[in-house]
Amino acid sequence: MNPFDSQSEDASDAIGRSLGRRPLARKKLSEMVEEELEQMIRRREFAEGEPLPSERELMAFFNVGRPSVREALAALKRKGLVQISNGERARVSRPSADTIISELSGMAKDFLSHPGGIAHFEQLRLFFESSLVRYAAEKATDEQLERLTKALDINRQSLADNAQFIRSDVEFHRVLAEIPGNPIFMAIHVALLDWLIAARPAVPDAELIEHNNISYQQHIAIVDAIRKRDPDEADRALQTHLNSVFATWQALSQKKKSRK
């Protein structure tokens, strides 16, 4: 586009109006320091466990003030790339599965707030946990089955207390996610349930009692199928359970909207 062309000027004015004449934001010094240090870490210029240069050395190297260096290190800590202890230099670390998933949290919550977002995440959960119960039916050890049985018993004891039942429900599914021994599965599962629970509507306790009893009976069916080492039956029981849960929350949500 020729900036001196009259048509270009008209187009530029139109674009300016649509964007509200918002200027492009300049990067902060701390962001530039963060990006450069991140690239150095990813290029293995600093090994895992190795301390980074001191704050004073980083200030001199990047020609920035202490606040910019500290903000950059704090951002790297949030990404799991460094560990920071009081009085010590930051050390390079490897991001955990939890750190990786937490980076997606903001985007996930935004997606959940859009129409159909919860349904898409419920479908993701169904596909994910379907694989978990099939694996459990085929591979779970006696010790893992014992933990699953214990989680089921706590589930039963919590039927009269909705807050406690929700915690025991989450714990039951968490034990399922632990069985493959994959930390990424665990991180995904914890985050997925956190996102879904936060997005669900608040419902009066009285309306959840029947739902809790149904969920508990469905948990029993899942555990029975796993004990029988029948992955197909375990999968069917899991799908019955999660489809029922989703239908219940949809109905309760619609009921709440109709009262407004």
UniProtKB/Swiss-Prot annotation:
Family matches, as CDD domains: WHTH_GntR
Task performed by this protein: Transcriptional repressor that controls expression of the genes required for the catabolism of sialic acids.
GO molecular function, one term: DNA-binding transcription factor activity
Recorded superkingdom: Bacteria
SUPFAM superfamilies given in the database record: GntR ligand-binding domain-like, Winged helix' DNA-binding domain
DNA-binding region: 55-74
Key words of the record: DNA-binding, Repressor, Transcription, Transcription regulation
Paired cysteines (S-S): none
Family indicated by similarity: Belongs to the NanR family.
Protein name as it appears in the record: HTH-type transcriptional repressor NanR
Biological processes annotated in GO: negative regulation of DNA-templated transcription
Species this chain originates from: Cronobacter sakazakii (strain ATCC BAA-894)
Pfam families: FCD, GntR
Domain spans labelled HTH gntR-type: 27-95
Record region (Disordered): 1-20
Entry-linked SMART domains: FCD, HTH_GNTR
